[in-house]
A protein has these predicted regions:
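Non-catalytic signal-transmission and effector/linker regions of two-component phosphorelay proteins
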Residues: 1-12, 116-130
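Two-component/phosphorelay signaling modules centered on CheY-like receiver
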Residues: 20-38, 108
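Helix N-cap/capping motif at the beta->alpha junctions
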Residues: 39-48, 69-71
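Receiver (REC) domain active-site loop signature in two-component systems and cognate sites
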Residues: 64
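Active-site residues of response regulator receiver
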Residues: 61
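Hydrophobic/aromatic residues positioned on beta-strands within the core alpha/beta folds
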Residues: 90-91
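A Lys-centered signature of the CheY-like receiver
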Residues: 113
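Conserved phosphotransfer cores of two-component systems
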Residues: 51-53, 76-85
Length: 130
């Protein structure tokens, strides 16, 4: 779990993915665009951050150890329901039957990996509203 800070006035994005190299890359890119970015390798770590920190948006994988992305989404809904509209799912498993129904039911952006950082940045701006 990494909570590096950017500028004090920046929006805080939580990156949830068990691919550590990917989250660290996204973290550096987001910080270069004046976002604060925290990382979590599991849904359990991410839930702890959501419960203890202000988060403006969540970029989340689906297939992760301990707590899958869809279950993390529902857990966040219990503790911070206002964040449900601020999820962006980024996954290599969008067509997996385990997740397909879930992804159709949520009204949030979903991107298949690999996705360009520019598309993520556009989506983040739309989700956060800046």
């Amino acid at each position: 779990m990494d909570t590096r800070n950017g500028p004090a006035s920046s929006k805080h994005v939580l990156l949830v993915d068990d691919d550590i190299d990917l989250t660290l890359t996204w973290q550096e890119l987001l910080q270069a665009h004046d976002y604060r970015a925290s990382t979590a390798a599991t849904g359990v770590q991410a839930l702890r951050l959501v419960m203890n920190c202000h988060v403006d948006a969540i970029l989340c994988d689906l297939s992760m150890p301990e707590l899958a992305g869809n279950l993390f989404y529902f857990a966040v809904g219990r503790v911070r329901p206002q964040l449900l509209k601020r999820f962006i799912f980024v996954t290599a498993n969008a067509d997996n039957p385990l997740y397909e129904t879930f992804l159709k039911s949520v009204k949030v952006p979903v991107f298949a990996k690999p996705v360009s950082f520019e598309r993520l940045l556009e989506s983040l701006k739309a989700v956060i509203g800046n």
